[in-house]
Amino acid sequence: GDIHGQYQDLLRLFEYGGYPPSANFLFLGDYVDRGKQSLETICLLLAYKIRYPSKIYLLRGNHEDAKINRIYGFYDECKRRFNVRLWKIFTDCFNCLPVAALIDDKILCMHGGLSPELDNLNQIREIQRPTEIPDSGLLCDLLWSDPDQKIEGWADSDRGISCTFGADKVAEFLDKNDLDLICRGHQVVEDGYEFFAKRRLVTIFSAPNYGGEFDNAGALLSVDESLVCSFEIMKPALASSSGHPLKKVPKMGKS
């Protein structure tokens, strides 16, 4: 799930799950922005990708987009610590990242969620890279959409971009494509993970005490050879280092 520049928590994740190459890792995007150490976070992940390419896989999140990370911290961190040229090099890198992964032909993983334009997995395979993230359409939705318990079908998103989808759309898509589970990030959830649509979709968020503001846990999803899923939970700190009280996470909060 999302890391958002929380480098120490990324190291904790590897402590829990094992450092590469002892385990295979799939990350769901949002490596940068908001946290203080986006550069360490993305550089460690890319270094592992270079060293153990078949052991670590990095999907693209909505923050791996120049329009977004120009605003939410990564650009400023690059400029302050190095230079704008470095940020532009990362932009070129992010434009090449894959946007979805399929585990054992049964578990579909992406950062955001489903799209009204998505009927089958070949549509994802046909997305050309490198690419920027458009403001609407399939690629946008894969990185930006959210599940919503209160609706059926599709609805506009409070984010002002992309859409939300109901449990009926999850069931419809999974049944049509012979899949078991959708695994996605993109929303801070109190326990680090949260199920939706009769456990046919799971949201995973891996940045505990997100941004130093929330009292959420972080989670790591483990999938064994039989596709049995289990969760490792990184408990949140009891108080924020800033001395301010931590906010409770709203159900399916935004990130």
From Swiss-Prot:
Binds 2 manganese ions per subunit. PROSITE patterns: SER_THR_PHOSPHATASE. It catalyses: O-phospho-L-seryl-[protein] + H2O = L-seryl-[protein] + phosphate; O-phospho-L-threonyl-[protein] + H2O = L-threonyl-[protein] + phosphate. Its EC number is 3.1.3.16. The active site is at H63. Mn(2+) 1 binds at D2, H4, D30. SMART domains: PP2Ac (SM00156). Belongs to the PPP phosphatase family. PP-1 subfamily. PANTHER family: SERINE/THREONINE PROTEIN PHOSPHATASE (PTHR11668), SERINE_THREONINE-PROTEIN PHOSPHATASE PP1 ISOZYME 8 (PTHR11668:SF432). This is Serine/threonine-protein phosphatase PP1. It comes from Brassica napus (Rape).
